[in-house]
Amino acid sequence: MEISTSILSVKKENAIQTFYNLEVAKTDYFHIDVMDGKFVEQNTMLYMLEYATTIKHISNIPLDVHLMVDKPREQIEDYIDLKPTYITVHYEAFKEEKQLEDTLLYIKQNGCRAGISIKPDTSVEKIYPYLEKISLVLVMTVEPGYGGQKLIETTIPKIKKLKTYIEENKLECFIEADGGINLENIEKLNEAGIDIAVVGSAIINSNNMKETIQKMKH
């Protein structure tokens, strides 16, 4: 299992040192939470792009971009030049199937892996038709918008169901879980079948980032 560290709670005055510490701690990805103040209440658009650009200049750790926005296409254009490994858009942000499919294609045409994210209340069956076209499903294990929330336990059976479907249909699609993940509950998610865990507060606020990340990986 890989760890994608959310930098949502990183303070600007400590940002560069924190990014360096996370690289030394061997995070697998930097998770970039892009919020527009519309799809979710919080707005991180300006400083997240600044953070992502800084990381690209000082680190070789890949970026994992999660767009929690009403108009994903506009934000994708901001991030494409940074060559993130993943750009993930929310299923709920699209009114029409064609809009979603066109957006996924646009991400892939620009050299990134496309992902779809779903909120805790969205059933996994709704994204089954898209699984052949994407590399990642991001299952929100809290309501999107804020860090430091408690994991919603009812999302775990949803992850198991998704994992079974992917394996039965021999699909090449990873599962990522995001929200409320810590040392106490990460093993449940590992057993449910996730490939990548997005972890924020539990790493950023720990006394030893490297030790915390290594414990989470094993």
PLM regions with names:
Residues 45-65, 106-115, 155-175, 179, ...:
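Alpha-helix-loop-beta-strand connector modules within alpha/beta enzyme cores
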Residues 15-20, 71-81, 122-134, 180-197:
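Catalytic cores of alpha/beta
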Residues 44-103, 116:
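Glycine/small-residue-rich loop that forms an oxyanion/phosphate-binding "nest" at active or ligand-binding sites
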Residues 3-6, 30-32, 63-67, 87-89, ...:
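Hydrophobic faces of well-ordered beta-strands that scaffold small-molecule active sites
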Residues 117-155:
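Histidine/lysine/aspartate-rich catalytic loop segments that bind and position anionic ligands
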